[in-house]
Design a protein with these regions (language model features):
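Short beta-strand/turn micro-motifs composed of small residues
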Residues: 54-55, 106
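Glycine-rich beta-to-alpha active-site loop
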Residues: 91-125
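Conserved CoA-thioester-binding segment of acyl-CoA-metabolizing enzymes
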Residues: 1-54, 93
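Hydrophobic/aromatic residues within transmembrane alpha-helices
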Residues: 16, 53, 66, 117-119
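A short, glycine- and basic residue-enriched loop/turn
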Residues: 21-24, 58-59, 64, 109
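Short, flexible helix/strand-to-coil boundary loops that buttress conserved ligand/catalytic motifs
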Residues: 27-28, 65, 74, 106
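Glycine- (often His-adjacent) and acidic-residue-rich active-site loop
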Residues: 55-91
């Protein structure tokens, strides 16, 4: 299985790619958790000046959350609250609180959870 959150650096710019193109970069639970970790790590990296977030491929930035998980990881109120209050909110807060400017490089569909990620960025292009 390919990495679902890719990180590349080009000098003072880090690019974080949501890498689930077969599902239009729909964000699943492991991606939400990994996005939080990656953004927290990049935030404290003093060698950076900017973090760009994008979707893999040309079809979508992110087409929301992975709908298959509604039946498995969000099937009860308790599990849905953990999913959203811990995993989704944790990732969005990590993007929002990044010490470096964040840019959502939007190409293609950007809805649901993808729109939330873009909205948490400082700039959207």
């Amino acid at each position: 299985m390919a990495e679902e959150i890719l990180v590349a650096r080009d000098g003072v710019v880090a690019t974080v790619t949501l890498n689930n193109p077969a599902k239009l970069n729909a964000v699943n639970a492991s991606m939400w958790r990994r996005l939080r970790t990656v953004m927290e790590e990049l935030s404290v990296d003093d060698s950076l000046r900017c973090v760009v977030l994008r979707g893999a491929g040309e079809a979508a930035f992110a087409a929301g959350g992975d709908l298959e998980e509604f039946l498995t990881l969000r099937d009860t109120l308790e599990r849905a609250l953990v999913y959203h209050e811990e995993w989704v909110a944790g990732a969005l807060n990590a993007v929002r609180n990044c010490l470096h400017p964040t840019v959502a490089l939007i190409h293609g569909a950007c809805i649901g959870g993808g729109l939330e990620i873009a909205g948490a960025c400082d700039l959207r292009i």
